[in-house]
């Protein structure tokens, strides 16, 4: 999928579903809440076609959902392949999940902010976190997130499974429902930036930054419904979870897990408002600058947000900017600046490495100098300062820049004297 035009969406989701009406509003509304901008949905012969569902119709009419019909058994991989090929060019990131899976950011409330740190990779693979029945025989009223709060122990074998959020531009093809083949030279990583084997569907369990809450069982009634419905991923007479699996899993140790509950107040408020078309198009949208073609417009508005400590808005503006300007070192340098302002040294260094790989602009070294000074890394700061003083790319007639160097010299000298006296 090389050579695509600029994407429209920073984060979209692809899913295939059948007869999921009781869960649609919660699932789609939740994912809008955490930053998903568009849904590519494949209706696999639902008894009531999805385009007859009023909520789905509202999403379609608001421009938030693209609906396809797909007939036959084991159509998950064909649907994924169709989505990657036909809709991938419209997306920076595309997640492939099911209706019983909820993407769950743990460090931030908006998944796009996390994904911005992984833009140099083809795929971010997130581990499953599998939940049980919480003792329900019949399907309870209310939300899935509220009803099911007990998961299997962290070391459970199910949790080695991952689900993939891919960059279509860097992705060659579908491997399984869990994993994709990256393009030549590209890498899939887990949340700690550790590369995964080519096309891997399993990874060491890690739930530090994000995970996929998989509501595997729900109630016994739901298990029976899934057994009757059959599978969408493979041609098999055995369901994902059969009665024997259900009884075995019921007997396994479970632990309380409330990590996703922080989203409930906003989710319930939004559901109570009825998901009006106006809300779907306007709420959680990127702040739109007047000229989307100019990186400087984005960085200026992002800087204004950062001055007011509205860091989420500031970072989301740069996510929007990356749809057009991912090859500009200035974008990555500004991202590093935002991370440093929040005390997030790791992301700042990663952003600066990316910036330097694109173009060794002076601003990048200035930001690196500020980062080292702020962190008290005197020797590293002195090395960057020495480079700046002798680099031919630096304008020595820039009064503002020279003042900054003088301040940096003094700060480094103070830090050095402080260490010696200690």
What is the meaning of each model-derived region?
Residues 47-96:
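Active-site-proximal specificity loops/subdomain of glycosyltransferases
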Residues 78, 105-289:
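Catalytic-site signature of metal-activated, phosphate-bearing donor transferases
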Residues 292, 326, 359-360, 393-396:
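Short coil turns that delineate tetratricopeptide repeat
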Residues 307, 341, 374-375, 411-414:
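Register position in tetratricopeptide repeats
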Residues 296, 330, 363-364, 397-400:
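Start-of-helix register in tetratricopeptide repeats
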Residues 1-29:
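N-proximal low-complexity "stem/linker" segments adjacent to membrane-targeting elements
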């Amino acid at each position: 999928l090389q050579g695509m035009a600029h994407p429209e969406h920073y984060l979209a989701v692809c899913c295939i579903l059948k007869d999921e009406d009781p869960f649609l509003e919660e699932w789609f509304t939740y994912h809008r809440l955490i930053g998903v901008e568009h849904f590519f949905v494949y209706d696999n012969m639902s008894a009531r076609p999805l385009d007859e569902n009023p909520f789905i119709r509202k999403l379609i009419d608001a421009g938030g959902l693209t609906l396809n019909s797909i007939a036959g058994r084991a159509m998950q991989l064909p649907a994924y392949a169709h989505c990657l090929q036909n809709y991938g060019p419209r997306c920076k990131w595309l997640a492939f999940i099911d209706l019983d899976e909820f993407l769950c950011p743990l460090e931030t409330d908006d998944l796009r902010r996390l994904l911005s740190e992984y833009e140099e990779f083809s795929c971010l693979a997130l581990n499953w976190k599998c939940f049980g029945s919480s003792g329900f025989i019949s399907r309870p009223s209310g939300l899935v997130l509220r009803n099911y709060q007990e998961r299997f122990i962290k070391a459970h074998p199910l949790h080695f499974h991952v689900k993939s959020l891919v960059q279509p531009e860097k992705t060659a093809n579908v491997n399984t429902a869990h994993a994709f083949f990256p393009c030549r030279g590209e890498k899939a990583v887990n949340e700690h930036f550790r590369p995964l084997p080519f096309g891997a569907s399993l990874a060491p369990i890690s739930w530090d930054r994000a995970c996929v809450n998989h509501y595997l069982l729900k109630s016994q009634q739901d298990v029976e419904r899934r057994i009757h419905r059959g599978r969408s991923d493979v041609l098999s007479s055995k369901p994902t979870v059969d009665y024997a699996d259900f009884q075995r899993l019921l007997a396994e140790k479970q632990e309380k897990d409330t990590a996703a509950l922080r989203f409930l107040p906003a989710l319930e408020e939004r559901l109570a408002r009825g998901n009006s078309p106006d809300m779907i198009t306007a709420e959680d949208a990127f702040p739109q600058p007047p000229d989307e073609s100019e990186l400087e417009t984005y960085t200026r508005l992002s800087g204004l947000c950062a001055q007011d400590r509205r860091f989420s808005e500031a970072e989301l503006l740069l996510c929007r900017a990356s749809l057009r300007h991912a090859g500009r070192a200035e974008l990555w340098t500004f991202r590093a600046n935002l991370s440093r302002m929040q005390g997030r040294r790791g992301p700042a260094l990663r952003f600066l490495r990316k910036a330097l790989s694109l173009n060794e602009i002076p601003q990048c070294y200035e930001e690196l100098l500020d980062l080292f000074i702020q962190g008290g890394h005197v020797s590293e700061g002195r090395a960057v300062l020495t480079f700046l003083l002798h680099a031919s790319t630096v304008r020595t007639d820039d009064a503002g820049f020279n003042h900054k160097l003088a301040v940096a010299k003094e700060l480094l000298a103070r830090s050095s004297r402080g260490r010696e006296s200690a």
